[in-house]
């Protein structure tokens, strides 16, 4: 039969695998991290809307999917809109589909002064996400890395004022976009700090900074400076 080296387990946990890879040691397989998101509802047998109100169901669905497929990271992520929603944006919550944006937080750039950074402990669905994070750390955190999604500052800006208005403002009212990115950055920092305090590492989604949406020039002017500050902040916390 096949001889196994005494120190090599037949199947490593994701954390063991990551540690071995970082040291350049032998691993049982390469890490694999699919973006399952709300697909976990199908595995667990709940409705996607259950994640809007129940931290326990959100955590248990994540765990069920992780146990079924054995991938290398569990991430608290339902949709792109819990953060703008926490700042006053309106969302559509289908019974069994992913939440979508209905109205941005402000209808006009002149209302920008009304925007305040979110409070992850009190606003919208964010307290549910934080509670789900705690369950995940308790239940599987010793064997698999648990991460928390956050949107980047420029994506925040687009969801706070609306995509079309924000992209127009990049040309016509650049100072407005900078203000939106700043309040987005402060919101992102508040949320990642709450997640890091629980023991998670943040992952940043910045879809509105894609080349399909903005040019590299616009990216360098508006998105990159705030994204860099967010990444630097996360690194300063040791993540």
What are these regions (language model features)?
Residues 105-116:
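Short, basic/glycine-rich phosphate-binding loops at helix/coil junctions
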Residues 62-91:
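Glycine-rich, N-terminal phosphate-binding loop and its surrounding beta-alpha-beta segment
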Residues 50-60, 67-69:
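Short, structured active-site "lid" loops
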Residues 3-41, 46-49, 61, 72, ...:
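Active-site loop segments of alpha/beta catalytic cores
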Residues 45, 87, 111:
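Flexible, glycine-rich active-site loops centered on histidine and acidic residues
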């Amino acid at each position: 039969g096949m001889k196994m080296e005494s120190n090599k387990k037949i199947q490593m946990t994701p954390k063991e695998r990551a540690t071995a890879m970082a040291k350049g040691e032998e691993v049982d397989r390469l890490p694999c991290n699919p973006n399952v998101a709300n697909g976990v509802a199908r595995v667990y047998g709940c409705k996607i809307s259950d994640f809007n109100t129940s931290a326990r169901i959100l955590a248990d669905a994540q765990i069920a999917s992780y146990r079924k497929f054995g991938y290398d990271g569990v991430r608290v992520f339902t949709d792109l809109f819990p953060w703008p929603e926490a700042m006053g944006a309106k969302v559509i919550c289908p019974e069994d589909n992913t939440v979508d944006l209905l109205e941005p937080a402000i209808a006009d750039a002149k209302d920008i002064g009304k925007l305040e950074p979110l409070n992850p402990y009190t606003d919208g669905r964010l307290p549910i996400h934080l509670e789900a994070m705690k369950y995940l750390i308790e239940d599987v955190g010793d064997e698999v890395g648990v991460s928390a999604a956050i949107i980047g500052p420029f994506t925040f800006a687009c969801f706070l004022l609306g995509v079309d208005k924000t992209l127009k403002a990049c040309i016509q009212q650049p100072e407005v976009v900078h203000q939106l990115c700043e309040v987005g950055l402060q919101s992102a920092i508040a949320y990642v700090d709450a997640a890091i305090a629980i023991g998670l590492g943040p992952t940043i989604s910045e879809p509105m900074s894609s080349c399909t949406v903005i040019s590299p020039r616009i990216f360098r002017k508006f998105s990159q400076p705030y994204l860099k500050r967010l990444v630097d902040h996360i690194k300063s916390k040791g993540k």
